[in-house]
Design a protein with these regions (language model features):
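Acidic catalytic/metal-coordinating carboxylates
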Residues: 50-53, 78-82
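Short hydrophobic/Thr-rich beta-strand motif most characteristic of the beta2 strand and flanking loop
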Residues: 42-49, 55-58
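Active-site beta3 strand of CheY-like receiver
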Residues: 63-69
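Active-site residues of response regulator receiver
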Residues: 71, 99
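Alpha4 helix (beta4-alpha4-beta5 surface) of REC/receiver domains from two-component response regulators
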Residues: 81, 92-94, 101-120, 126, ...
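Conserved acidic carboxylate
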Residues: 25
Length: 140
């Protein structure tokens, strides 16, 4: 069941509607900073500390996230495994991956169609906001 989209005032370059996002990141400081930055941009945020928690939230929401923003390299279940499982359950699911490792970016290429982009770490909060806005704009 899709959620209701609420319009809000925007500044230039900002996505015009609030989106429901899931941030999956094992580093608590990165997870918290990204969540705050995206909340300030007007989005509703859920967070998970690893891919297993992320997949559980995706299942509970019945795939109802506009975008999942996930680290690739995490304990328990990594972002690639989570993306594959989420795509099998919800083929329309779109995921933006983050990584600090060049070799992990290559692993993401096998998920074309599910992965909308890979953000290289470290990144600024402005960069992550801009990449999320670009990813969301692709689906408007």
């Amino acid at each position: 069941m899709p959620f209701a989209v609420q319009e809000k005032s925007t500044f230039p370059g900002q996505h015009s509607a609030m989106a429901k996002l899931l941030i999956v990141e094992d580093d608590e400081s990165v997870r918290t900073l990204a969540a705050r930055a995206l909340e300030r941009a007007g989005h509703m945020i859920d967070i998970a500390a690893d891919g297993a928690q992320g997949l559980a939230l995706i299942r509970a929401a019945r795939g109802g996230y506009d975008l999942v923003v996930s680290d690739i390299r995490m304990p328990e279940m990594d972002g690639i495994q989570m993306a594959k499982a989420a795509a099998a359950l919800f083929p329309a699911m779109k995921i933006l991956l983050m990584t600090g490792y060049a070799d992990q970016r290559e692993r993401a290429e096998e998920l074309n169609g599910v992965i909308v982009d890979v953000v290289q770490k470290p990144f600024t909060l402005a960069e992550v906001r801009a990449r999320v806005e670009q990813a969301l704009a692709c689906f408007v």
